[in-house]
């Protein structure tokens, strides 16, 4: 679809390893940019529905990294996932501590813990 291709090139001019998938009347682009893996869905008219990108601590904006590390200083950031949908820009940060795994969501300078579970005790 020409509208989709045009929108994609405008939004992600430096995309690499691009693959397209068609779902009903929508298109999913999988690609890499700035060492983050993206899944981006477009409507037929070229409007982007969402962009989800998967990365690591170094991909987080400095402000968000500082906010997370200030509260969870004894946790190591293992994944950083950026979800852009309509006007929203959400970062999902996965972390690992000595005894627990945590997931926090950061949106508009607000941070919420969305998942927390203890590591399994392993017996030798």
Task: Say what each PLM segment does.
Residues 1-124:
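Interaction-mediating elements
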């Amino acid at each position: 679809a020409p509208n989709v291709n045009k929108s994609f090139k405008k939004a992600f001019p430096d995309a690499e390893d691009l693959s397209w998938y068609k779902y009903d009347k929508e298109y999913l682009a999988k690609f890499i940019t700035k060492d983050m893996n993206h899944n981006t869905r477009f409507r037929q008219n070229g409007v982007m529905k969402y962009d989800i990108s998967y990365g690591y601590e170094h991909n987080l904006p400095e402000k968000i990294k500082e906010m997370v590390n200030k509260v969870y200083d004894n946790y190591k950031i293992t994944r950083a996932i950026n979800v852009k949908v309509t006007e929203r820009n959400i970062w999902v940060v996965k972390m690992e501590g000595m005894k627990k795994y945590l997931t926090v969501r950061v949106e508009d300078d607000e941070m919420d813990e969305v998942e927390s579970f203890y590591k399994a005790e392993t017996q030798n």
